[in-house]
Amino acid sequence: MVLYSMIDYKAVTNELINDDTCAQGSVYATFDQLVSLLGEPFGSSADGKVQAMWQVKFGDGTIATIYDYKEYDTAVEDVTCWSVGGHSERAEGLVEAILSR
């Protein structure tokens, strides 16, 4: 886990920035916690595998995506285990850090 007292980050909602990211791990949070921290989700997937996704860009350039994957039988508001995507495991650590503040 990345332990920083101040982590610079922003949710990106006006453009797609998650090209070539892949699964790096998962985090536990409620939908409401994520909305409170990052705002409304950026979107969903056309194939229905993802109901909600957030994109986060950290100050060091790390990009992370937070999304429910194949939670077909669970309403998005009830999902508590979220996949984290990125280009490295650092993405998961940074997401864990901002969730634990």
Question: Where are each of the predicted segments found?
Answer:
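Residues within mature, well-folded domains
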Residues: 2-101
